Amino acid sequence: MRAMRLAAVAMATAGLSLAGPAIVEAKTPAAAVKTVAPESVGFDSARLKKLDDYMAGVIAQKRVAGMTTLLVRHGKVVAFNTYGTMDGQSPMTKDAIFRIYSMSKPVTGVAMMILYEEGKWKLDDPVTKFIPEFRNLKVMTGVGPDGKPTTVPVTRPPTMREIMSHTAGFGYGLQIREPVDKMFRERGVLWSADLPDMIGKVADIPLKFQPGTDWSYSIAVDIQGYLVEKLSGQKLGDFMQSRIFGPLKMTDTGFYTGADKASRLAKLYQTDIRTWQMVPATELFGGAVPDYTKKPALESGGGGLVSTTVDYGRFAQMLLNKGELDGARILAPATVELMGTNVIPKSVLETLSTKQGGSFSDAVGFGMDVMVVNDARKAGSISGDGEMSWGGAAGTWFWVDPTNDLYFVGMVQRLGGTGGEDLQIMSRLLTYQALVKPEN
C-alpha cells in the first residue's frame, strides 16, 4: 500500500486556468495549461529540477515506459511534465489517458459522500439495511481437516463507516496469500458479470475478521459502487458523469475511452517476475486485461476508471478547495473534512502500526476511501498535516496537501511495481525539499 497525494489546478494571472471556460475551446484541456515561475509560489527552481531529473532517470533506467507529472500550488501550475513514450515509440503526451485502477476509489468515495449529504445513508447504518444479501455473513477462523474454511457468524453486520474504510473484513483477491483472498480469486469476484452478480459472490465468501476489529484492503469500494446504484437509481457511471465528471469538466474520465479516444490510451506494461523487466501486460489479477475502449458490463468503483493527468488534477483541486471548483459545488467543506478524517478505531491503529509495516499509526490513518496524514512530522514526512492520498495498481499516484495548498498527480502504466525506488516517496520528498518559502 502506498501513500499518494493531490493539490490545485489553474493558471497564472496572464494565463488560463485548468478549470476555466477557455479550456473548452482548446483541442484538449491539457493544451491550455500554462505554468508559472516556481518562485512565484514558494519553490526554488534549481531544487525543483531535482524532481524533473529524477523522473527522467526513471525513464532512462527503463523502469517505466512513460510518465506524466503535475504539481500545482495556490491553483497555479508549477510543473506539468511528460517523460518517455506512450507505447515504446510515440512520445508521451499531456493528454494521454491512463488506467487509474485504485485511484478510482476516492472518486467513488466522493459519489458516496454526495449521497451521504442527501441523507441516503448514515455512517453507523448496518450495510444490511441496503444489501440484504449480506445478512448471513460469516468470519473465517481457520481451515478444517477437509481443507474447507471453518467459520463463525458475524457478531454484527458491518457498518457503512466500515465499508468506507476497509475495516468491514471483506477480502479482495488482488493477491492470493490468504485463504479468503484465494476464494475471491477462485470465484472470479473481480470478473463478475455485473455488480449484482459480484454482490452475490461476495455474500458467500467469509470475512477475514469480525467487522471493525482490523483493517484489510478490500472489495469494499466495489460494494460502494453497488450502493451508489441502489441509493441513486442510476448506473454508477451515469451518476459519476452527472454529479462529478460533468460539473468538474473532467471530459476524459469514465469507465472506458470509446473508439474516438483509443489512440490516446497509454500502453499497459507489467513486471516479468522472472526477470523483473518491463513487458507488455497480458494478465490482471487472475484475468485478461480488459479492453478499456469498450463499455464494461461491470463498472468497478474500486478500480475501473480511466482518466488524464489534467482531469484527475481537477478532481484533486476540488478536494483542495473543500468541495468546489469553478463554481461547481460537489460537496460541502465539512463533508470533505469528514472524508479526510481518520475513522480507523484507535485499538486497530495500534495493532496496524506493526502489522502493516508502519503504514498506519496515530500519525497516519485512513478516512473515507483515502489515506490521511494526521501529523506529518510525527509520521517522518516533510509534507503537510491533513494530506489525503492514494494510488493505483499500474503505479498512478496523487496527494492533496491542504496545509501547503498544493497537489501532485503522477501517471504511469506498469503493473507490479516500478522496479526500484518508490515514485510516490521520491516525488513527495523532492517536491517538499524544493518548497523553500511555504509562506509565499
Residue positions per predicted region:
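Short, surface-exposed beta-strand/loop micro-motifs that present aromatic residues
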Residues: 387-389, 394-407
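Short, conserved catalytic-motif segment at the N-terminal edge
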Residues: 33-100, 120-122, 136-145, 421, ...
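Positively charged n-region of N-terminal signal peptides that target proteins for export
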Residues: 1-5
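Bacterial N-terminal signal peptides
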Residues: 8-19
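Active-site SXXK
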Residues: 49-56, 69, 75-77, 97-131, ...
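Short, surface-exposed loop or secondary-structure junction motifs
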Residues: 132, 137-383
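Signal peptide processing junction and immediate N-terminal pro/mature segment
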Residues: 18-29
